[in-house]
Design a protein with these regions (language model features):
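C-terminal motif of bacterial Sec signal peptides marking the signal peptidase cleavage site
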Residues: 21-24
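Bacterial signal peptide processing site
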Residues: 26-29
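Blade/loop signatures of beta-propeller domains
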Residues: 35-51, 57-93
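Extracytoplasmic beta-rich repeat domains
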Residues: 64, 93-113, 141-160, 186-203, ...
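Short loop/turn segments that connect beta-strands within beta-propeller blades
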Residues: 132-135, 179-182, 219-223, 265-267, ...
């Protein structure tokens, strides 16, 4: 009898040790986990459980900004679009075909950029064009993909402009540095895997994040590699991906694993890390951990949201977790003055105090608008003190950012698109699904 009891105790002890080892497995694979300071509360899953602030001062936005450039898909290296000046007339000025449009298997994904006196756009077959923003005339076009490859296969990537150079990445893992005036290739390099996100650059280096969670840093003039950093690669993810950000001497990198890393941009030393993944999901294996909305820098705050994770705010300098909310989103949020606006994956619109994380108001978009077929929100912008939601159908939903009240629904106001529009010099530019670049004022 005593022998049987001893066997039972030994079996239970072995089971306990196995569980402990399994729980530590992720730390073994990924390396040491850095637990950042800051409050962490157990929260329920779903934005419906969020409580509103009891009272708040009237929301005041910053003055509308007249933009004269748009160097990345999210305007600047901070990924914050702010409150942008626009005529709000949405009158079509011109339209020009830029190449192959979207198909069911190959959606347009590269956002246009605007620098100097030209727009730069890419079609679904990796043809980049320079376009005159006044009349839509094509200045030059160039196909950029490896010889012998099908250009439709290398989807994704993006554009970025800095230091008089246009940088372009594609799904073949190529990085090009181009002369903006004639499209001449200044230099070209390759990374180890396909690239779905746009590159980002300062005055000395350009950075590329590939789908295998590896970041590469290249000299902006010569193309020589300066450093690289590899991280755990999560195979479960989405085609859509977010952009990196730059802040002072730091580069902010969102990974497909749901983690956000901050590096010293000159040498790749990791400064701190955090995660948007929720710890209380019953089956974490079913969670898509991607960060598809770009991280936004607003003041000293880094604001990051996961596709099925949460919205977190960190001090960008030291990683201190300031606050978090159970909000998931694939749309890059917008900050203006001291306020953050975000739309969740279940189409709930939020206004948040950026410093405290207090939710000031919410609005359920589904209560006023029926999403049919594949129609979805592709972008959120604050234009001329109004909160615009751009839909893939070309519809626009307009809210008052001070109260969240719906003010207008504009049906088929612009051409349907899968790419967020850009706004420069009070003109709005859209790449339509059929490969047309259209200018609205």
């Amino acid at each position: 009898m005593q022998l049987n009891i001893a066997k039972i105790y030994i079996s239970r002890l072995l089971l306990f040790l196995i569980i402990i080892n399994l729980s530590a497995c992720e730390s073994v694979i990924r390396g040491k986990e850095y637990i950042l300071p800051g409050e962490r509360e157990n929260i329920l899953i779903g934005s419906a459980n969020i409580k509103l602030a009891k009272s708040f001062d009237t929301i005041q936005l910053s003055e509308p900004l007249v933009t004269n450039r748009w160097i990345s898909s999210d305007r600047e290296t901070t990924n914050n679009k702010n409150n942008i000046a626009f005529s709000e007339e949405f009158i079509k000025k011109w339209s020009v075909n830029i190449g192959q449009g979207s198909s069911k298997l190959n959606l347009s994904s590269v956002s246009p950029i605007y620098i100097g006196d030209a727009l730069f756009v890419v079609d679904t077959e990796n043809t980049i064009s320079s376009v005159n923003p006044d009349n839509g005339a094509i200045n030059w076009s160039k196909s950029l993909f490896p010889e012998g490859e099908d250009p439709k296969i290398g989807f994704g990537g993006g554009l970025f402009a800095n230091s008089g150079i246009i940088f372009f990445t594609n799904g073949f893992g190529e990085l090009y540095a181009l002369d903006p005036y004639n499209g001449d290739i200044l230099w070209r390099d390759m990374v180890s895997s396909p690239v779905r996100a746009a590159p980002i650059a300062d005055n000395s280096m350009v950075f590329v994040l590939s789908v295998d969670n590896k970041i590469n840093a290249f000299d902006i003039q010569s193309g020589s590699k300066k450093w690289e950093y590899s991280w755990f690669s999560d195979t479960a993810g989405l085609v859509q991906t977010s952009n990196m950000a730059l802040f002072e001497d730091k580069i902010i990198v969102p990974y497909k694993s749901g983690e956000i890393f901050v590096f010293k941009k000159n040498n790749g030393n990791r400064l701190w890390a955090d995660s948007v993944n929720r710890k209380n999901i019953k089956n974490s294996l079913s969670q898509i951990k991607d960060i598809t909305a770009s991280p936004v820098i607003h003041g000293n705050l880094l604001l990051t949201v996961g596709f099925q994770g949460r919205l977190i705010a960190n001090n960008v300098n030291n990683g201190f977790r300031v606050w978090e909310l159970p909000i998931s989103s694939s749309i890059t949020p917008v900050a203006s003055n001291n306020y953050l606006f975000i739309v969740s994956n279940d189409n709930i619109l939020f206004a948040i105090d950026a410093e405290s994380g207090d939710v000031l108001w919410t609005h359920d978009i589904n209560s006023n608008y029926e999403f049919k077929n594949d129609n979805k929100i592709i972008s959120m912008q604050i234009l001329q003190n109004k909160l615009y939601l751009f839909l893939s159908s070309g519809d626009l939903i307009v809210h008052d950012p001070k109260t969240g009240k719906l003010t207008d629904i504009l049906k088929n106001k612009i051409e349907g698109s899968t790419i967020p529009p850009i706004i420069v010099n009070k003109n709005l530019y859209v790449i339509s699904n059929d490969g047309e670049l259209i200018s609205y004022r």
